[in-house]
Amino acid sequence: MHLSDFYFDLPDELIARYPKPERSSSRLLRLSGENGDISHHTFSDVYDLINEGDLLIFNNTRVIPARMYGRKASGGKIEVLIERVLTESRFLAHVRSSKAPKAGTELILGEDKLGEGKGVKAVMIGRQDALFELEITEKSTALLDILQKIGHMPLPPYIDRPDEDADQERYQTVYSKIPGAVAAPTAGLHFDEELLAKLKAKGVNFAFVTLHVGAGTFQPVRVNNIEEHHMHAEYVEVPQQVVDAIVATKAAGKRVIAVGTTSVRSVESAALAAQEKGFAQIIEPFFADTSIFIYPGKQFRVVDCLITNFHLPESTLIMLVSAFAGYKNTMNAYKSAVENRYRFFSYGDAMFITKNNHVKGLD
């Protein structure tokens, strides 16, 4: 399979730079993986597509204000985007500057928010491949508390605008709980408290995994043969409660519905690990890094339906959707979405997809 197989032409004006005023007022494209049928809805209509006894798997990670602006103590401007928090004071980050900082370089961060001369001091410890390990030298305040004061919401590059106060709420799911992500699990942005309450009252079950989405999710695939691509690693937690809920749902003949590709990658990583260890049960608890890469031909052991946003051309996420719904079905659905002026990417519209059980490649 070639990278270009997953290209589609997207007019720039269809990239959503701001969210809709109401979360559940986004549009929803329903795609049948079985026969490729497409229908058009409002996201709140998802209530009618989910049945009593079905299980929704949410990712409860919370986005941290992970982007910081500052300068080297010697004067040069610098931008820091956290990839992963290591300790209360240390983190791995992407760093942009005219010249890469060396070990021992002192940085002053956050003067744009705190005022000149009042920034937070940090030091460059070393490098791990493309990432820099940094340490805040002020140890009396926890890193997450410091980020609340000097950090900016890490909006994706394609949104192409500075973050605003409203993004603190809207680039966050209403059920987010555990801080650590530097990108939102965007399918969940469409759920508001009212819709969640209605689904709960209908008898729909909820379960929560944690995958702290890294900035690597926006890194382009750089190989033509997609099978040569290596995914970045992200930390996943699939606790026993989620395992029990999935097993009970399957036993009852109901559906497991993943809210977002991160939820898919979480539970499918846990299921793959269970299979590789020879467990009889379909899935076992999982607390580890995952670099699972799902593309057409890969099997889904757990997920029956997927709620997801529209993804970038040639991205690993459109490959995952193609593996789930079938390549031709997926590309036809994206063509329909463009023709019908759907909004794309993180602040855009969504899809509700039922699984195609017969995907073997580019079908």
Swiss-Prot record:
Subcellular location: Cytoplasm
UniProt keyword Transferase, yes or no: yes
UniProt entry keywords in alphabetical sequence: Cytoplasm, Queuosine biosynthesis, S-adenosyl-L-methionine, Transferase
One GO MF term: S-adenosylmethionine:tRNA ribosyltransferase-isomerase activity
InterPro entries referenced in this protein's UniProt entry, alphabetically: QueA (IPR003699), QueA_dom1 (IPR042118), QueA_dom2 (IPR042119), QueA_sf (IPR036100)
Matching Pfam families: Queuosine_synth (PF02547)
One GO biological process term: queuosine biosynthetic process
Keyword S-adenosyl-L-methionine: yes
The enzyme's E.C. designation: 2.4.99.17
Enzyme class: transferase
Record's GO cellular component terms: cytoplasm
Pathway connected to this protein: tRNA modification; tRNA-queuosine biosynthesis
The reaction(s) this protein catalyses: 7-aminomethyl-7-carbaguanosine(34) in tRNA + S-adenosyl-L-methionine = epoxyqueuosine(34) in tRNA + adenine + L-methionine + 2 H(+)
Oligomeric and partner information: Monomer.
Cited NCBIfam families: PRK00147.1, queA
Family stated for the protein in its record: Belongs to the QueA family.
Function summary: Transfers and isomerizes the ribose moiety from AdoMet to the 7-aminomethyl group of 7-deazaguanine (preQ1-tRNA) to give epoxyqueuosine (oQ-tRNA).
The name this protein goes by in its record: S-adenosylmethionine:tRNA ribosyltransferase-isomerase
Lineage: Bacteria, Pseudomonadati, Pseudomonadota, Gammaproteobacteria, Pasteurellales
